[in-house]
Amino acid sequence: MRILIILSIILCSLFTKADLEYVDDDIYNYNGSSNINGCREVYDPYEKFNRKIFAFNSVLDYIFLRPLAVGYKNLTNDYMKARVNSFVGNIDMPLTAVNYGLQLNYDKTMKSVWRFIINTTLGIGGLFDVAGKVGLSSDRQTFGNTLAHYGVGPGPYLVLPIIGSTNARDMTDPIFTNYALNPLMYYTHKDFELSVLAVSKINDRYNVLSFSDYVMKNSLDPYATIRSALHQAREASVQYPKNFKCPKPKNVNSN
């Protein structure tokens, strides 16, 4: 059983966590238009390699992960999807609290902690967003957000086997986000952790199903379209220091 769960997580990583997660408005609150102005251009010096890996990942996604997302879409109603989305968002709150703490933003750290406590208890394990109704909102934070907070730019655009699309700054997120900085990983059973990760990945893939289908069917260059969408959305989800200026490499790809 554990092997099946691990396999599901690996497959679900192909087109969600790194590729398109940041494109979905329910996952991130895009409030950093100044960041888009600072890092408007995509630095893609490894484009030839990236395109080959993108094609490889896309085939695996079409064979394995997309059918799971389509099945999830067809077999669950909107009410259940909303509960799963709320549950997944709540599971991320301890990680968000840790990253806000690393950013020395203690107000948002405590809001994230209380949001997790309220939704886990009154919200029945996070199935209902009770905290949001009383004004306790919190934008999801990863280690990449923390690095950006201290002035680390996105760096080169990368497409990695299995992991998917990312950049030099965010490429460690799968490790730090899912394990090293996530308190739940130290206090829950391994089977529970793996099950939650699998559900989270499938939920993420479903959230971008319409977008990815449209791009793959209609875009003349799906690679460039997804690269641009991911870069813009990710840059809008991070907050750089005041007066931060994104480095401008000689060879860049404009959005």
From Swiss-Prot:
GO cellular component: membrane
A Pfam family annotated for this UniProt entry: MlaA
GO BP: intermembrane phospholipid transfer
Signal sequence interval, chain numbering: 1-18
Record keywords, A-Z: Signal
Similarity-based family: Belongs to the MlaA family.
Protein's name in the database: Uncharacterized protein RBE_1331
Lineage: Bacteria, Pseudomonadati, Pseudomonadota, Alphaproteobacteria, Rickettsiales
